[in-house]
């Protein structure tokens, strides 16, 4: 029986620029950074976070480079949950995160949409409990 999702791969152009965005701007932590023969096994997650992690996977050919920033076909790729929307929203703004929509209220919670360094759309969301 499948019991969870542990990692989701994100194709990136460069490991270091992806770490800079996700860790320095968004406040994620590197969970593992293992050098393999031809790549790195590089996992990140929100500091103090739980659940799924993002595996940063450097593109190695033209086919993979073509999907950078387009892995969700223009839809939202990630949904990042917060327990303090206003504080996190203001902090991300102060760090130069590019919000493109919101904040706005939906029936399920408060949402703002931003783009990562490659143009992937990401929701910051605080759910109604």
What is the role of each PLM region?
Residues 5-6, 73-77:
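Eukaryotic phosphotyrosine signaling hubs
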Residues 33, 45-46, 67-70, 89, ...:
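Short secondary-structure boundary/capping segments
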Residues 47-52, 60-63, 84-86:
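Short, charged/polar surface micro-motifs in flexible loops or helix N-caps
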Residues 39-41, 62-67:
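A short, acidic/glycine-rich surface segment
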Residues 54-55, 123:
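Conserved beta-strand in the GNAT
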Residues 2, 10-53:
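Core segments of cupin and vicinal oxygen chelate
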Residues 1, 10, 40-43, 80, ...:
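Vicinal oxygen chelate
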Residues 21, 86-91:
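Short amphipathic alpha-helices within nucleic acid-binding modules
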